[in-house]
């Protein structure tokens, strides 16, 4: 089964779910139907794993807009498979978890699962797309589906605000990403990602290289919640917990990181990229970790924790970006180890953070609150959830015998090794190492503190909104499976490292022998500096979490947050955009037409200037006599007159006369079909206009605005000049192959003796079909307007 068939299967399952929207009997089974999608996807990607491990890839290419190199092009290589397995397997756990979390009576289940599968479909599209424009389409689809999932409980104000904020920020980043892709196309002449990577040196030598880096980083940073674009992620926690566990910890927030991985071979050729990504990641890491200690809502704690961990991964991607400059030698081993660590920690983070979110969802579902100030002693009521969240928090903190310890130690190893890299010196190495250590200490602090406050101590049921909470086993099953993998990966890391992570690393550095530089993950590397840093984090972190009352000091600090800045700028944007809309949308049709024609004129003039004007060597003008001259003069005079006349009936009549003059031109040019069509349409249109006057209100005649009329005349003359110029340019050469021979065989190809009928009914049949649909829709609109009667009464309006 190809990738196209897989994505088509996901669409089919979504369509089936849509049919259950109106069937109450089947609505409660929506989750079980939705489970088919991640099961099919997981089986497919696991089936492809042995082949990809050997360096092969699956490729599907369907030509589309070949002139612009926009094709439906998919490629499943090691990196795509790594992310696809995360998306499908975590998706399987989340969809099953959602069947236990959501109410079958009160929640609109089919709608939720359609949104969730739409997001899964979009994410798989991002990671398998081999065309930049195709990737952008899926990129924005994730923003749309994320918006729909966050606002799923649309009656809540927090859901509405969080959805709008996340949509605004991520779509802004998506537009920046599109601009970056367009610049890449300008430089390389291709949208194929594999071809772009092959031309990395050409891009690096271009004067657009730095703008390309900035635009792609904007796309990645907004999607992966990097400072200062992180503010949307905590507000997105208003979504149902399955959404938070899937989108905002394991998948969507990793899309930006995937983008950085995919274009490392190109972007890593710039030291600007390495510095920018590394320091933005480290700032995000420490910012998220410190802010997590200030929260009381468990999902808010995990949201800032996710921001911090994403920053950690991004910083490793930045540090490892130098592999593009040094693909061989001793330096390549350091870069390769750091990139490997980034992939390793990304996988670990998806597991322990998904388990943590699911645990929080169980507690919220059963107790009615996520406020750690109201929770205590829950290990007696939720023993399985206690173990799951405890081990997951310890793994996140980098405690031995859990997978997080291995990737955290590799992170420290990468930080201290930067002193050997040409982009860094001893001072920078010390700075980034200190930032990493401090952020890691706070990671342990908020993780252990949350477990202590929620699960340890005396159980106080009276403070809980819901009474008699319990822990259904099937509810805990997905998070328990994720938790079991945490120590398993610690003891057999190379099973995952060699079979899943190494193929992904090969795809990041296409054409390089990364097997020689990829590290062998070991639980013991001796007593070295990374181990010492890990021990410092553990000791200091536990002391702060269990012995020091740091919480009161953390919440005494009052700072003007970036959220306040966002809200202020959002209000200003809303104010000025409202002013702009009111200026443009003034309910004057001629104003809209004027603006449209002006923009069209500028685009056409710019295109003609860029293309250059050919040498004029021939001008073909049709033969004309007195009738043509008189008709042309009539059209010209009536056109000028229409600019100044204000009587509606007179304007309609004069407009009809112009239409009849066009009919005369068609007759003189021996086009009877066109003349007949023009005559009928002009007559019907004129009659409809006159009849409609009886239903229109009496509007006082407006005074003639000389400036406005002058603009109309100038725009009209400008369009006339442009059209005539285009006709003359078209006469100067055959830049495009002629289509006359194509129409010469019209009778044989279509059976139509009339060339116009052959064009409309066969050669451009689809275009004609859609034109007919437009007419039908317009007719329905007119029918509705003519038959609309104002409904009276409050009950009818409701």
From Swiss-Prot:
Membrane topology, as annotated: Multi-pass membrane protein
One example GO MF annotation: antiporter activity
Signal peptide: none
Major site of localization recorded for this protein: membrane
Transmembrane segments: 1-21, 33-53, 78-98, 109-129, 133-153, 167-187, 209-229, 241-261, 272-292, 300-320, 337-357, 381-401, 431-451, 472-492, 526-546, 593-613, 625-645, 649-669, 674-694, 710-730, 766-786
Pfam families in alphabetical order: MbhD, MbhE, Proton_antipo_M, Proton_antipo_N
Complex formation: May form a heterooligomeric complex that consists of seven subunits: mnhA2, mnhB2, mnhC2, mnhD2, mnhE2, mnhF2 and mnhG2.
Full protein name: Putative antiporter subunit mnhA2
Lineage: Bacteria, Bacillati, Bacillota, Bacilli, Bacillales
